[in-house]
Curated annotation (Swiss-Prot):
Binds ribosomal protein uS19. Residues 94-166 form the PRC barrel domain. GO terms for biological process: ribosomal small subunit biogenesis; rRNA processing. InterPro entries: PRC_barrel-like_sf (IPR011033), PRC_RimM (IPR056792), RimM (IPR011961), RimM_N (IPR002676), RimM_N_sf (IPR036976), Transl_B-barrel_sf (IPR009000). This is Ribosome maturation factor RimM. GO terms for cellular component: cytoplasm; ribosome. Pfam families: PRC_RimM, RimM. Its main location: cytoplasm. Keywords: Chaperone, Cytoplasm, Ribosome biogenesis, rRNA processing. Signal peptide: none annotated. It comes from the Bacteria.
Length: 167
């Protein structure tokens, strides 16, 4: 089963097992409605836990999980990731995509044709950057409209312009 990271447990609060969670999703409001997460240091060791209560405050989710209703139970989860299955992911708007959907897409330049595949997406402060593996080297392309002209998940491709500028 493939799991996707949506948050990271930072620290416990109080004596009743409440956890401060840093969202790593574009949809932090989903923490208020999601009733279960896989929790673990890695996706491979994550176990399913039910949410007992959830609130959102100052950019962080505050969660209590069943079976972790004490400070000691909460402390054991510090540093763990909160994961969800693919079918539990929030649907992206048409003009957006999850990183896992972009990795592996073929990259085409408007004049050069196919130039490689997206091998990674780097999340930078200003905008994402696509790492394109050309076979000979890896090239970093800013994921902005000035360079990316089309992203088609169904066709499995990204079209860009001015690829030679990055070589």
């Amino acid at each position: 089963m493939e799991l996707f990271l949506t948050g990271v447990v930072l620290k416990p609060k109080g004596l009743k097992g409440e956890l401060k969670v840093k969202p790593v999703t574009d949809f932090p409001e989903s923490f208020l409605t999601r009733r279960e997460y896989y929790i673990g240091k890695t996706p491979e060791d994550a176990v399913l836990r039910k949410v007992q209560s959830a609130r959102f405050h100052q950019g962080f989710a505050w969660l209590v999980f069943e079976g972790a209703g004490s400070r000691e139970g909460a402390e054991a989860l510090v540093g763990c990731g909160l994961y969800v299955t693919r079918d539990a992911l929030v649907a992206m708007p048409d003009d957006r995509a999850y990183i896992h959907e972009l990795i592996g897409l073929d990259v085409f330049d408007e004049t050069e044709g196919r130039v490689g595949k997206i091998s990674d997406v780097l999340q930078m402060p200003a905008h994402d950057v696509y790492e394109v593996d050309t076979g000979d080297r890896k090239v970093l392309i800013p994921a902005v409209e000035d360079f990316i002209t089309e992203t088609d998940l169904e066709k499995g491709m990204v079209r860009l312009k001015r690829f030679k500028e990055f070589l």
